[in-house]
């Protein structure tokens, strides 16, 4: 039996397991719509999005409109006559004229338990806010931002030391499993739509680099969660002698000291005063150097207790 005629819309690595799942299921993926190739690295060479590379491996036609909302792009998608559009981390807002094209609508895979954490960076904000559970929601798309009817929800626990990279990888796989379940229900005529309760929502805006600056007056658990949510990108950071110091792995500690003051330096890490306690820095990266476990970093860098971490150009000794 021929599968559904599906257009897949997605861009980063996060979206790839779902596209693979659609191919494995035998659905007829008639096109992939993804963002344009972007210049990367020192040579500014154009690099295709991961979804484009995967589509080309399977000889699936690829469309890369600068703006999918233009009448030309919408008409091109209309001519393909899809039964369904599946969207995962595409990176552009779809106009109503596009949402109306497929007979089964447009299904989005969102990396949170809606209606909580609508927006561009749900898995990061779950970590920053210290949540212990998140998941995947499939939803029927409407013209709002992650406001459509919910279809299938799958929840997973968040580990106490889990960072955004680890959670990204797990949710990416869970997204593929959830679309599998969603399409089975759709084909069986058993898909149930549930309205979102707007009173329960919270927003997860795109991360900005400057949001990663550590405020050492905050409580240790808040700083730890900030580091978890910002690892690996854009990175939580402070300053050491005017240079950016990125923090990739930290632990909460009980000793107290002045906010931002290095209290102790040892193989187990760098202990820094923070709020009503302290933070043990276990993995870091100083500007111009590689990301390293703290013990390896200290083997080639002398750091004295009493040094103050803080804003650029205002480092105290």
From Swiss-Prot:
Protein name: Methionyl-tRNA formyltransferase
Transferase is among the record's keywords: yes
Protein function: Attaches a formyl group to the free amino group of methionyl-tRNA(fMet). The formyl group appears to play a dual role in the initiator identity of N-formylmethionyl-tRNA by promoting its recognition by IF2 and preventing the misappropriation of this tRNA by the elongation apparatus.
Binding site for (6S)-5,6,7,8-tetrahydrofolate: 112-115
Gene symbol of the encoding locus: fmt
Catalytic reaction equation(s): L-methionyl-tRNA(fMet) + (6R)-10-formyltetrahydrofolate = N-formyl-L-methionyl-tRNA(fMet) + (6S)-5,6,7,8-tetrahydrofolate + H(+)
Entry similarity comment: Belongs to the Fmt family.
Cellular component GO terms, alphabetical: cytosol
Disulfide bonds: none
E.C. designation(s): 2.1.2.9
Keyword Protein biosynthesis in record: yes
Keywords: Protein biosynthesis, Transferase
GO biological process: conversion of methionyl-tRNA to N-formyl-methionyl-tRNA
Organism: Geobacter sulfurreducens (strain ATCC 51573 / DSM 12127 / PCA)
MF term (GO), any: methionyl-tRNA formyltransferase activity
């Amino acid at each position: 039996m021929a599968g559904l005629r599906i257009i897949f819309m997605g861009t980063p690595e996060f979206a790839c397991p779902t596209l693979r799942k659609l191919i494995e299921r035998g659905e007829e993926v008639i096109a992939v719509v993804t963002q344009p190739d972007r210049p990367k690295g020192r040579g500014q060479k154009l690099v295709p999005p991961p979804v484009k590379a995967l589509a080309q491996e399977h000889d699936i036609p690829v469309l890369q409109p600068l703006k999918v909302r233009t009448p030309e792009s919408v008409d091109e998608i209309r001519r393909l006559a899809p039964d369904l559009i599946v969207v995962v981390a595409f990176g552009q807002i779809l106009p109503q004229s596009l949402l109306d094209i497929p007979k089964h609508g447009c299904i989005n895979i969102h990396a949170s338990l809606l209606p909580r954490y609508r927006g561009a960076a749900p898995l990061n904000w779950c970590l920053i806010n210290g949540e212990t559970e998140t998941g995947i929601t499939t939803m029927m798309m409407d013209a709002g931002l992650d406001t459509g009817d919910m279809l299938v929800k799958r929840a997973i626990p968040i580990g106490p030391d889990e960072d955004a990279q680890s959670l990204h990888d797990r949710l990416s796989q869970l997204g593929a499993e959830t679309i599998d379940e969603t399409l089975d229900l759709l084909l069986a005529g058993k898909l149930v739509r549930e309205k979102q309760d707007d009173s329960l929502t919270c927003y997860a805006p795109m991360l900005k680099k400057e949001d990663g600056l550590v405020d050492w007056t905050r409580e240790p658990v808040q700083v730890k969660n900030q580091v978890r949510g910002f690892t690996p990108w854009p990175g939580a950071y402070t300053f050491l002698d005017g240079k950016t110091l990125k923090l990739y792995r930290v632990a909460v500690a009980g000793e107290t000291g002045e906010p931002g003051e290095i209290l102790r330096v040892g193989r187990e890490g760098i202990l820094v005063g923070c709020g009503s306690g302290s933070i043990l820095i276990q993995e870091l990266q100083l500007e111009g150097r590689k990301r390293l476990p703290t013990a390896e970093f200290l083997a080639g860098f002398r750091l004295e207790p009493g040094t103050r971490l803080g804003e650029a150009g205002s480092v105290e000794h």
